[in-house]
Amino acid sequence: MTRQAAEVAKRRTFAIISHPDAGKTTITEKLLLMGKAIAVAGTVKSRKSDRHATSDWMEMEKQRGISITTSVMQFPYREHMINLLDTPGHEDFSEDTYRTLTAVDSALMVLDGGKGVEPRTIALMDVCRLRDTPIVSFINKLDRDIRDPIELLDEIEAVLKIKAAPITWPIGCYRDFKGVYHLADDYIIVYTAGHGHERTETKIIEKLDSDEARAHLGDEYERFLEQLELVQGACHEFNQQEFLDGQLTPVFFGTALGNFGVDHVLDAVVDWAPRPLPRVANERTVEPVEEKFSGFIFKIQANMDPKHRDRIAFMRICSGKYEKGMKMRHVRTGKDVRIGDALTFFSSEREQLEEAYAGDIIGLHNHGTIQIGDTFSEGETLGFTGIPHFAPELFRRVRLRDPLKSKQLRQGLQQLAEEGATQVFFPERSNDIILGAVGVLQFDVVASRLKEEYKVECSYEPITVYSARWIECSDKKKLEEFSNKAVENLALDGGGHLTYLAPTRVNLALMEERWPDVKFRATREHH
């Protein structure tokens, strides 16, 4: 095996998906602890703390104490190199969260055992389904009261339409939480709470049918056996291929706060989740072990560092090897650029990078020339697909405080749209400018960045738009007919693409029914 193939085989690139407050921050912290990336868990501090979490960047995040921005953390574990992409998990998240999922090979779904499947989890799973991303599941908070575990598995299957295969099974919960039982390998992992940065020694009881297990479970023993019978009768067995196809998720139980069960999940990512996968480009499929370098941009981040007024473009490497000072072609512009200062991400300790392989994420300094979806290569004309725009779910009309600044406003919005901070629409029948976003916070971010970076002050007004759909139609005559009929609701987006702004859900359904030859798309590829 070549050095490059060996490096690729070691890589695991995944993201965590969860509803806010299901425990994502805590589990991230414990995962970093396992990779000894942070000496003391707790660098990702609580909101009340005045020392800010290392992955909270922009000014506004400091005020709100949330990580709007998606950071990337790389750490070693069991002779593998783990790339963990953090997804903004606050009530207000953004299209970045969705796009981050296009750059990973697998995902870890964290559910709150007391609440089960929540709305944000459903939305994120829909995005994972676009690429059949393999999902590992962790049911968290067993140190509190949780719902019946069988009920939780049923809910995963019914709501998320994915088979659930329990790997471990909880013995009690809350004050009676005694650990988990490994279904396939017949042993108990005893629960001892490890607080903060303690890693407690794992105590294992071999075989459920043993005096030691009976003593540990006490009065619960018989009841646990009955429950197990139910579980083994009703649940799916783990199947590696179905997992890789995104049709089945292995389920683990534990408590991130008590530092219990998190290692089981990380082991599953190492043992079962795929190494960096081939990526589809318009021209061909690119294999990760190819010698020539290639990668795509999935996110652009403004001033990660208040001291450096720069933008960082996050690139997922798809093939080859990045070496410091190498030349690569920016395919969209046709220009060759020498990259001497790519960044690797170790939370916010920004480090200069010497080399990186397929599956790794690197940061390029961007002075406004790089856009989301851009491909970089060693000269070959490639355009990676699967980094879409997602239909916004919230809309506002923009109002300028100073009408003379409309040029700066358009310029600023164009730039912010290319960075993926918002989507901008220009209705065909009016001079309005409409912004679209996936999370409310995006509007605040845009307003504060327009003010700081473009010296433009704006306010927002509500507008009746339910959703946006990108219009495609191969029949020119039909498209013209449709455009004349629907002109009141048509707009061009920032890239000049025809978009239908549906005022209501009913209206959208009616239009789709009336115009069967017109495709109303909820995602649009970049470029």
From Swiss-Prot:
It holds the Pfam family EF-G_D2. Its main location: cytoplasm. InterPro entries: EF-G-like_DII, EFG_III/V, G_TR_CS, P-loop_NTPase, PrfC, RF3_C, RF3_dom_3_sf, RF3_GTP-bd. Keywords: Cytoplasm, GTP-binding, Nucleotide-binding, Protein biosynthesis. Transmembrane segments: none annotated. SUPFAM superfamilies: EF-G C-terminal domain-like, P-loop containing nucleoside triphosphate hydrolases, Translation proteins. GTP binds at residues 18-25, 86-90, 140-143. The keyword Signal does not apply. Disulfide bonds: none annotated. Belongs to the TRAFAC class translation factor GTPase superfamily. Classic translation factor GTPase family. PrfC subfamily. This is Peptide chain release factor 3. The gene is prfC.
